[in-house]
Regions:
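A bilobed periplasmic-binding-protein/Venus flytrap-type ligand-binding module shared by bacterial periplasmic
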Residues: 8, 62, 127-131
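Surface-exposed binding/hinge segments that line
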Residues: 6, 41-93, 117-119
Length: 138
């Protein structure tokens, strides 16, 4: 089974780096190869992921299932942050400073908010992701 994702070209991670098919490939292969328990059933049937261009990802499965469309949409690991993470269980991105963006941690995402600060057991403070693709234009 093949699922092809045609990505938008205006999506950026919260640190301003473009989201591309390389991130899709990296995420799916990282989760599959590391046998991350939460994603194991979703990624175990992924045979390969191809990226014919910057905004196209082709995900090949060893089985046929209507769940594959859901199983192919885990695009949450920015390759530029996670590529050197060997032990995902020990990685705490919210505690590590971002390598290029002052005041930001390595907890980088695609959503409308980013972590500003937190206190365990008390609060989490989020702020607007200025790189979010769906912000209203001025």
């Amino acid at each position: 089974t093949l699922i092809t994702w045609n990505l938008r070209d205006d999506i950026k991670w919260s640190d301003g780096v473009h989201f591309t098919s390389a991130d899709v490939k990296f995420t799916l292969e990282y989760l599959r190869d590391n046998k991350a328990p939460r994603y194991l059933s979703a990624t175990q049937n992924i045979v390969k992921v191809e990226t014919p261009d910057k905004y196209t990802a082709k995900v090949y499965f060893s089985n046929t299932s209507y769940w594959n469309i859901d199983n192919a949409d885990y695009c949450g690991l920015p390759q530029h942050i996670w590529k050197d993470v060997k032990d995902y269980k020990a990685f705490e991105p919210w505690k590590e400073a971002h390598p290029t963006v002052a005041g930001m941690t390595k907890l980088v995402g695609l959503g409308p908010f980013v972590l500003k600060e937190y206190k365990v057991g008390e609060y989490v403070r989020m702020i607007k992701n200025v790189n979010y693709f769906a912000l209203p234009t001025k």
